[in-house]
From Swiss-Prot:
It is found in: Nucleus; Cytoplasm. Disruption phenotype: Leads to light-independent conidiation, loss of sclerotial development and oxalic acid production, and reduced virulence on several host plants. Increases conidiation and melanin biosynthesis. Its main location: nucleus. Residues 294-308, 355-365, 385-402, 516-538 have a biased composition (Polar residues). The gene is VEL1. Residues 334-346 have a biased composition (Pro residues). Gene3D superfamilies: Velvet domain. This is Developmental and secondary metabolism regulator VEL1. Belongs to the velvet family. VeA subfamily.
Length: 575
């Protein structure tokens, strides 16, 4: 079944007589007319951005042998000769000459491949076909294509009887007349008029026709354009005309629809805020989000705020290293009078109530303090919370020197039988020294523990005085004072040596009441390592041995030089 063919032009027919006595008839027909084209211009990019004439012109040639008028025979496939068709471009409407004599206008330029050889195809019919798939026009306008047929005979019997004269040569076009004498011009055929559009007005290339597909299927190089969805094949380099995508459709391919999500993400990426929280974006006058942790500082704990909603913060407590204001030293003086301790008989029942039940201390804990309560902050939070419960005998004394001693005295120096109520039980309640649980309890009720702490302070000398009774009768007076120092609080995990030296200074009145020896010995003399065996109950710290050593040292005049050497000289008064 023959493929459908577009509108044909009027066939052009010629007849010639060969030397062999045969009469040949040539029939030339344009079976596919050009319709539109896009002007490619004459600039530097004209060759890169060029569109072919659409659809590609196809010319059919048939040759008949009319030697016998009663029997016409087609000999296209059996005739031994070479044919080619040369295409030229002509203006469809002639331009009238003006009055002013001007130079002849330059002819329209046809670019591409204007020459086509004959292809012997079986479809749509058995004939010879000339295909022009690569013809382009540089300027826009109305044009026609002129096709000139040339033949190269191979056998002597097929040449013309009469040689070509000057008259016949003048009838040929200028392009055909310039051909070599070996080629014989046979005929000229013109196509229908078509329009060349500018780049802005060009409607686009149409889909390939059935004739173009039929020709391409038989091996001819024709660009096949399918539907719009298969027009982008820029990833395939090179290729056949039937497989390569049309360049114009690649240029006319519509851009993807505008995606607002992609554009918004691109803008955020350019502003370096892709992962930034929108709330953290601020202007020049807004507060930086990095200043917000100042509000959530450790001294503003949630447990203090509900109990003291209207209590103002004491001055100087915003930072841990700023000392308290002058009003803090006078704060203990405005405390309410201490309530009298309950009777000793109620002590066993008040102790569990302090730990588990809401006793009187719990009710007093809910009341806001009368004066500006000191807020424990910074590194000395635990020590500051304990230091505010001691009745200030000397308000100018530093509170950091007495923190660890009072805390450890709760658990080591106060016997349970000699105490009245149990308001100091919360100190033993927290063996792990939980800071968050201890601070709110002590900071809300300083008067509840002030009286009980007076008892602990008053009982400290009794503890120190009872210890020498259990010691050896040979112990010296200095060992008694040393035992008193040993009963001091044991160092904790955050115990500081400077604080330990300051806490020992609180026992100065206790050491003054105890009898002292006239000969004060150094630490190395008392705790020296024994070099001889001890027998008969002798001790390194015996009084007799110490007196002999002191007497011997005074007689020998032993002293240490600045360089560390020990000098031994007799005393000057004993010589």
């Amino acid at each position: 079944m023959a493929a459908s063919i577009g509108p044909k032009s009027i066939p052009e027919t010629i007849t010639r007589q060969t030397k062999g006595g045969r009469k040949l008839k040539y029939t030339l027909t344009v079976i596919q007319q050009p319709e539109r084209a896009r002007a490619c211009g004459s600039g530097a990019k004209s060759s890169a951005d060029r569109r072919p004439v659409d659809p590609p012109p196809v010319v059919q040639l048939r040759i008949y042998d009319e030697t016998d008028p009663r029997q016409e025979k087609e000999i296209t496939f059996h005739y031994n000769a070479n044919f080619f068709l040369f295409a030229t471009l002509e203006v469809a409407r002639n331009i009238a000459q003006g009055r002013v004599q001007t130079s002849a206008p330059q002819a329209p330029v046809l670019t591409g491949m204007p020459v086509s050889g004959m292809a012997y195809l079986d479809r749509p019919n058995e004939a010879g076909y000339f295909i022009f798939p690569d013809l382009s026009v540089r300027h826009e306008g109305q044009y026609k294509l002129s096709f000139n047929l040339y033949e190269e005979t191979k056998e002597e019997k097929d040449t013309d009887i009469e040689p070509s004269n000057d008259s016949s040569m003048r009838q040929m076009s200028s392009a055909a007349a310039a051909a070599e004498s070996s080629f014989d011009w046979r005929m000229e055929l013109k196509s229908d008029q078509f329009t060349v559009y500018s780049a802005k007005k060009f409607p686009g290339l149409s889909e390939s026709t059935d004739l173009s597909r039929t020709v391409a299927e038989q091996g001819c190089r024709v660009r096949i354009r399918r539907d719009v969805r298969m027009r982008r094949r820029d990833t395939k380099p090179g290729g056949d005309f039937g497989e390569k995508e049309d360049e114009y459709q690649q240029g006319r391919a519509t851009s993807p629809p505008f995606d607002y999500n992609i554009q918004a993400a691109r803008q955020r990426a350019l502003s370096a805020s892709v992962h930034e929280d929108p709330q953290q974006r601020r202007g020049s006058g807004e507060i930086s989000p990095y200043h917000s942790p100042v509000v959530n500082t450790p001294f503003r704990t949630p447990s203090i705020s509900p109990s003291t909603p209207n209590a103002p913060l004491p001055p100087g407590n915003q930072l841990g290293w700023i000392p308290n204001g002058p009003g803090y030293a006078a704060a203990p003086s405005i405390q309410p009078p201490h309530p009298p301790p309950p009777p000793p008989s109620s002590y066993p029942q008040s102790m569990p109530a302090t730990h588990h039940n809401q006793g009187p201390s719990t009710q007093f804990r809910q009341q806001p303090p009368q004066g500006p309560p000191p807020a424990p902050i910074g590194y000395d939070e635990r020590r500051s919370s304990y230091s505010q419960f001691r009745p200030p005998t000397n308000p100018s004394q530093q509170q950091s020197y007495e923190s660890d001693y009072r805390r450890m005295s709760f658990g080591y120096q106060i016997p349970a039988s000699s105490q009245g109520p149990q308001p100091i039980a919360p100190a033993v309640q927290n063996p792990a020294y939980n800071q968050q649980s201890m601070e709110p309890t002590y900071s809300r009720n300083p008067p509840a523990y002030s009286t009980s702490f007076q008892d602990s302070v008053a009982l400290a000398p009794l503890r120190a005085a009872e210890q020498p009774l259990a010691m050896s009768p040979l112990a010296s007076v200095t060992s008694i004072s040393r035992g008193t120092q040993n009963s001091a609080p044991m160092p904790s995990h955050n115990y500081n040596k400077l604080e330990r030296s300051g806490s020992y200074s609180q026992y100065a009145p206790i050491e003054a009441e105890a009898p002292k020896s006239t000969n004060k010995r150094s630490f190395n003399d008392v705790f020296s390592t024994p070099t001889e065996s001890l027998s008969n109950g002798r001790r390194p710290s015996a009084i007799g041995i110490d007196i002999e050593e002191n007497t011997r040292k005074q007689e020998q005049m032993i002293y240490r030089r600045a360089n560390g050497n020990i000098q031994n000289k007799p005393a000057p008064g004993l010589n």
